[in-house]
A protein has these predicted regions:
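Charged docking surfaces used in two-component/phosphorelay signaling
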Residues: 15-23
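Short hydrophobic/Thr-rich beta-strand motif most characteristic of the beta2 strand and flanking loop
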Residues: 25-32, 40
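Acidic catalytic/metal-coordinating carboxylates
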Residues: 33-36, 59-65
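Active-site beta3 strand of CheY-like receiver
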Residues: 44-50
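Receiver (REC) domain active-site loop signature in two-component systems and cognate sites
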Residues: 55
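Alpha4 helix (beta4-alpha4-beta5 surface) of REC/receiver domains from two-component response regulators
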Residues: 62, 85-100
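A Lys-centered signature of the CheY-like receiver
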Residues: 104
Length: 107
């Protein structure tokens, strides 16, 4: 079974994303900020990380940079899912190692 870590400070977004991913047979874990997400990745590296940009404690971008620097052999796919919708954010995310970039709100 594929695994996904949802990293978002919004409980509502995490709940909706969890519901969608579980219907697609993903095993889902959640984190409310980047620091918590790093801890969860150290315990069990997911296949996919669904990542918000703006969060307290540690942003999604900080998390992504630290995750990629650690150079784990089993690096997850990282999909930013954020309200940041300008080209500068998109370019920065992709250059830092994000695999995809999806803008909220989404249908």
């Amino acid at each position: 079974m594929k695994t996904c870590l949802i990293v978002d400070d919004s409980k509502v977004i995490r709940k909706v994303a969890r519901h969608i991913l579980e219907t697609l047979d993903f095993q889902v874990d959640e984190a409310g900020d980047g620091r918590e997400a790093l801890t969860r990745c150290e315990a069990a590296m997911p296949d996919v990380v669904l990542l918000d940009w703006n969060m307290p404690v540690m942003s999604g971008m900080e998390f992504l940079k630290l995750l990629r620097q650690r150079g784990h052999e089993d690096q997850p796919k990282v999909v930013f899912c954020t309200t940041e919708n300008d080209m500068a954010h998109i370019r920065a995310a992709l250059e830092a190692g994000a695999d995809e970039y999806v803008m909220k709100p989404f249908d």
